């Protein structure tokens, strides 16, 4: 009986530790997200509606990609709010049917038009948010290969099985940010004239 009690206590401690870790992780993400002002709400909403994408998801992608810094540029040369590489942006311009101007990748409207349009193209291709996000970061060719090789289930993708560390972490971050934003913003973003700090929104939603 003593052995069973000890095992029960150890098991209970492990479960408690796991729950605590999950809550702590969510809390850290929520806190970090709440400290960030969300910018360009009107523009994000405009192009999200144009391409039938959840604006909360678009904001989550922008948050992870550039932290709402329109001048952001990665070491690989990705630019703007949605961190578009030249090749990706050029392809997206063809997809959405506009002329391509590489010098405009830091233009807010142009970048969002291409970025949200490209995500919509990926979502329509895979019919799955997680796969579309994985392709946005890791490339369509790689995601198709993982599906073909049976690494990723097209109908029920498991993020933890994504082979690329960067892509796996990227999808995880966007999904986590989306969950946090969805909690506070519900189904739409406030306009640019509204105070958008999540600490204020959390007060309004939960009081």
What are these regions (language model features)?
Residues 23-207:
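Catalytic glycan-binding domains that act on GlcNAc-containing polysaccharides
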